[in-house]
């Protein structure tokens, strides 16, 4: 899943003497053909094993807490308005909606290449603990300013965790999963995460009106997000590092040891020797990574991702962040608007499930384009819906299409760069979507107040149309192709 220059030569048994023979080879494990095989070829053709499935599960649960944090404020926003006496036109309310996204942008700028420097595993674990801690502190906020600060700091960790944590997760999954199963298994991880979206909606519906032991219900919803740190403590010792990242750092023995864990879990033997590398393997500094991104074909791909991430947040986070405010602007009370949004959010895991069979059957670029245009169409229908049934119906269709889109593009963007620059490329461009998402309340709320929901979703649709055209013109084809084919340099 990597460029050819990252496939390591040398003997695969650098550490073999330290391991029992059965652990190295497996008594009944069938060997894979070793003639001329690179380490990348071996990983691409390996059957899915127990460790692959474990990593998919770990990534999915980690992303669960990430999605919980992102959609949190949209579900408790009405309760926060009542708690702090904020109107939807007030700067403080806009900052509450935007603060986590602004933090994500800062996190990306400061930590966007973190995973390329310290590894996929360490970046994932570190940042999950970070944003869990500030989520817990935010639950004890004494005023709106303190909550804004905590949401900002949470956002820094949330971006770093995706690299924010999604860009770590995207890289991790892209690098370890066999090419024929890459899309389907990655979609299972994302599907697990999206269960958090309706869950936080229904938790808010239940807890927002309550005081439990004198504690406001919305504070409990915030505090539950901190459980991600507990999860880290439970899994960190079993989570492997990406062999491809280790190869990119020139850590031959460590790469082979990590790969051996995947091979043992899949019941196959590692070859005695891999084909030699195209070039020496060593860590790449920031200047070298930037230089590679300026070369063909990555220059056009990087430009595509810049435009893509500047505008895609209008659809995905524009709806997720502001849908509750749109419903409330039509005269529904806090409970009713929270109920409608919680029901609409059921579409997120449904859409993610639908993407699983689609990702390997439909060219991923085509799937991204079709789904983002569907988001635009369903969002407009949501804006013009005149009764509660249609509001919920088109809300579900919008969120469903959103997650077909999200799963497809997360797999897609991780495939179109080699491993040594993957986190840097995705992290730096993804940061743009965070700052745009942070600005959305300041851009779209005035449109909603002055011109109505139709104008607001019309603005969103124009942005998504530009994304679709850019993908069609600049995006490469990737489905059922190896990383060496996709990334020739």
Across the structure, where does each feature detected by a protein language model lie?
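Transmembrane-helix signature of 12-pass secondary carriers
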Residues: 2-489
